[in-house]
């Protein structure tokens, strides 16, 4: 092998011999086979290799993908999410009273100030959707960028790195490993927030075998999962009431 050939090979290598973590957490090199420009952050849609156009029939309404993610909880569609709306949103998803209360309090207290239009805090802890990108924490998957766009390659990397049992699903243990692998140094808030967020998603959308599917995660990013789960839960409640 010539020096030029070696340089060309090394330029595309994804595993470093003396960095074992690069061997255990593999990355894919075939993303652009079915997904155009996978490393390009998307502002309006959340595509993956199986859904290169994003979620069918999901309306973005001009919101960024991160804004779409939280818009489900804006029950009166005024662009502001108050704690009682967060609480009601979790109830619509099927969470019990105590869990909904704890999650609503924690989310609005943690995120409100960063999204406020001014410097003075609000005793009502509102979350302003147009500023939700300012509440993005560290130690996350980097699937959202700092402006609230969605990077499809980073969704795919979750599974190439951590899905060791089923290629397109993550077990609870694999989710834990992922949150550990995403930790930024001394980011204590981000460590906790990441584990809580993924734990809530696992409780909401894991299947009967204890796995969280890639499709559920993708649809969580654009918020369409919440609409789907709320509709299913409402139908179950109606069925139980009827019978």
Swiss-Prot record:
<feature type="binding site">
    <location>
        <position position="74"/>
    </location>
    <ligand>
        <name>Ca(2+)</name>
    </ligand>
</feature>
<feature type="binding site">
    <location>
        <position position="76"/>
    </location>
    <ligand>
        <name>Ca(2+)</name>
    </ligand>
</feature>
<keyword id="KW-0551">Lipid droplet</keyword>
<comment type="subunit">
    <text>Homodimer.</text>
</comment>
<keyword id="KW-0408">Iron</keyword>
<dbReference type="GO" id="GO:0031408">
    <property type="term" value="P:oxylipin biosynthetic process"/>
</dbReference>
<keyword id="KW-0106">Calcium</keyword>
<feature type="modified residue" description="Phosphoserine">
    <location>
        <position position="224"/>
    </location>
</feature>
<feature type="binding site" description="axial binding residue">
    <location>
        <position position="69"/>
    </location>
    <ligand>
        <name>heme</name>
    </ligand>
</feature>
<keyword id="KW-0007">Acetylation</keyword>
<feature type="short sequence motif" description="Proline-knot">
    <location>
        <begin position="117"/>
        <end position="126"/>
    </location>
</feature>
<dbReference type="GO" id="GO:0006952">
    <property type="term" value="P:defense response"/>
</dbReference>
<feature type="binding site">
    <location>
        <position position="85"/>
    </location>
    <ligand>
        <name>Ca(2+)</name>
    </ligand>
</feature>
<dbReference type="GO" id="GO:0004497">
    <property type="term" value="F:monooxygenase activity"/>
</dbReference>
<feature type="binding site">
    <location>
        <position position="78"/>
    </location>
    <ligand>
        <name>Ca(2+)</name>
    </ligand>
</feature>
<keyword id="KW-0349">Heme</keyword>
<dbReference type="GO" id="GO:0004392">
    <property type="term" value="F:heme oxygenase (decyclizing) activity"/>
</dbReference>
<dbReference type="InterPro" id="IPR007736">
    <property type="entry name" value="Caleosin-related"/>
</dbReference>
<dbReference type="GO" id="GO:0005811">
    <property type="term" value="C:lipid droplet"/>
</dbReference>
<comment type="similarity">
    <text>Belongs to the caleosin family.</text>
</comment>
<dbReference type="GO" id="GO:0071614">
    <property type="term" value="F:linoleic acid epoxygenase activity"/>
</dbReference>
<keyword id="KW-1015">Disulfide bond</keyword>
<keyword id="KW-0597">Phosphoprotein</keyword>
<feature type="modified residue" description="N-acetylthreonine">
    <location>
        <position position="2"/>
    </location>
</feature>
<dbReference type="GO" id="GO:0005509">
    <property type="term" value="F:calcium ion binding"/>
</dbReference>
<protein>
    <recommendedName>
        <fullName>Peroxygenase 2</fullName>
        <ecNumber>1.11.2.3</ecNumber>
    </recommendedName>
</protein>
<keyword id="KW-0560">Oxidoreductase</keyword>
<dbReference type="GO" id="GO:1990137">
    <property type="term" value="F:plant seed peroxygenase activity"/>
</dbReference>
<feature type="disulfide bond">
    <location>
        <begin position="220"/>
        <end position="229"/>
    </location>
</feature>
<comment type="function">
    <text>Calcium-binding peroxygenase involved in the degradation of storage lipid in oil bodies. May be involved in the interaction between oil bodies and vacuoles during seed germination and in the oxylipin signaling pathways and plant defense responses. Can catalyze sulfoxidation of thiobenzamide, hydroxylation of aniline and epoxidation of oleic acid.</text>
</comment>
<dbReference type="Pfam" id="PF05042">
    <property type="entry name" value="Caleosin"/>
</dbReference>
<keyword id="KW-0479">Metal-binding</keyword>
<feature type="domain" description="EF-hand">
    <location>
        <begin position="61"/>
        <end position="96"/>
    </location>
</feature>
């Amino acid at each position: 092998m010539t020096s030029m050939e070696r340089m060309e090979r090394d330029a595309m290598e994804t595993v470093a011999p003396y960095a074992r973590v690069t061997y255990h957490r593999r990355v894919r090199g075939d993303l652009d086979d079915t997904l155009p420009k996978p490393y390009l952050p998307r502002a309006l849609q959340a595509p993956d290799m199986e859904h290169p156009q994003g979620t069918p029939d999901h309306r973005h309404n001009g919101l960024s993908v991160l804004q779409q993610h939280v818009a489900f909880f804006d029950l009166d569609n005024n662009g502001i999410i108050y704690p009682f709306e967060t609480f009601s949103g979790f109830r619509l998803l099927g969470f019990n009273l105590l869990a909904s209360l704890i999650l609503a309090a924690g989310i609005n207290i943690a995120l409100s100030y960063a999204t406020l239009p001014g410097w003075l805090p609000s005793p009502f802890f509102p979350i302003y959707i147009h500023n939700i990108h300012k509440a993005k924490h560290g130690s996350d998957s980097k699937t959202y960028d700092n402006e609230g766009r969605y990077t499809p390659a980073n969704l795919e990397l979750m599974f190439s790195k951590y899905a060791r049992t089923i290629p397109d699903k993550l077990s609870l243990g694999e989710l834990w490993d992922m949150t550990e692998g995403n930790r930024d140094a001394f980011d204590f808030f981000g460590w906790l927030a990441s584990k809580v967020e993924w734990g809530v998603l696992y409780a909401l959308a894991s299947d009967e075998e204890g796995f969280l599917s890639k499709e559920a995660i993708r649809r969580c990013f654009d918020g369409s999962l919440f609409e789907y789960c709320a509709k299913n839960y409402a139908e179950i409640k109606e069925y139980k009431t009827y019978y």
